Design a protein with these regions (language model features):
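Thiamine diphosphate
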Residues: 1-125
């Protein structure tokens, strides 16, 4: 997650760090973006935006809830209101891009890895 990426960037300031995280999990530590910007850490974060707390759906299955009701499913949605990771990152001082296809992802990764300081790529799934 993002806090681990911060730790890695502080431990190895001469290396680029990549953080990979889902949008639901990232919501638990969104303030990490501000820390990345404040400390000018050399991190590129990829947010995999499936617009859901999908990991919690798996946990429902793990505890025997094979077919959750519509209210439970609604509680796992991150689209009301929709999250805008580009806007959130920008408001905390982190450059960000949104990508929806492989070609755009490749270009955004090249930019993120070539640029010093923090950046974020919202990968819309």
């Amino acid at each position: 997650g993002m806090p681990v990426a911060i730790g890695a960037a502080i431990a190895c300031p001469d290396r680029k760090v990549m953080g990979l995280i889902g949008d639901g999990s990232a919501m638990y530590t969104v303030q990490s973006l501000w820390t990345m910007a404040r400390e000018n850490l050399n991190i590129t974060v990829l947010i995999f935006a499936n617009r859901s707390y999908h990991i919690l759906r798996g946990e429902l299955t793990n505890v025997g809830v094979g077919n959750p009701g519509p209210r439970a499913i609604d509680m796992l949605s991150l689209d009301r209101p929709a999250l805008d990771w580009v806007q959130m990152a920008g408001s905390m001082g982190v450059e960000a891009n949104r990508v929806t296809d492989c070609a755009s992802l490749e270009a955004a990764l090249e930019d993120g890895l070539a640029t010093d300081g923090p950046s974020l790529i919202e990968v819309v799934l």
